[in-house]
């Protein structure tokens, strides 16, 4: 039975960049655990702020954190109060100077993490899993996606035996490395246990820049 490789991990270094941009030798393990603590803390504090990607860059005793969010106003707060409080908490957590950069996501319906999160929240509110998936697919295709695939797994409708059910529209070429495919998985806590939600979104091809081989001509 064929297994699927992680679509983002497969494309890192080809058309995707790393979410953590730093180099270390002896401190590698410490930095890695610090990164995990930063991500976990931000995801907990900003659970309702539609934060998708968290990028971390490091310099000497300085950490730059870029938050990609569909709700920048909620992250910043009135007069910057929320982001200042978050910065102070991260400074205390890491013992380093943390700089926070906020990047607005212009099209949240083309972000797999946000689409998956939306489906998961609907499932927690007892929306039918088929309806939640089909509505998400329609919104994503209207937003300009070339294709989308969703899958919900677990005790669907409270069934005794867990199963998976998914829907797709358009094309999702997982083997094409130049294909810009966003992938995410989320969990929904329901009265019957956890449901897993997976989302693949194909946003078009990213062609590498053409190299000039004729000496500047």
UniProtKB/Swiss-Prot annotation:
Keywords: Ribonucleoprotein, Ribosomal protein, RNA-binding, rRNA-binding
One GO location term (cellular component): cytosolic small ribosomal subunit
SMART domains: KH
GO BP annotations listed: translation
Entry GO MF terms: mRNA binding; rRNA binding; structural constituent of ribosome
UniProt keyword Coiled coil present: no
Residue intervals of the KH type-2 domain: 29-97
InterPro entries: KH_dom, KH_dom-like_a/b, KH_dom_type_2, KH_sf_prok-type, Ribosomal_S3_C_sf, Ribosomal_uS3_bac-typ, Ribosomal_uS3_C, Ribosomal_uS3_CS
Assembly information from the UniProt record: Part of the 30S ribosomal subunit. Forms a tight complex with proteins S10 and S14.
Stated family: Belongs to the universal ribosomal protein uS3 family.
Role summary: Binds the lower part of the 30S subunit head. Binds mRNA in the 70S ribosome, positioning it for translation.
HAMAP family for this protein: Ribosomal_uS3_B (MF_01309_B)
Name the record gives this protein: Small ribosomal subunit protein uS3
Annotated gene: rpsC
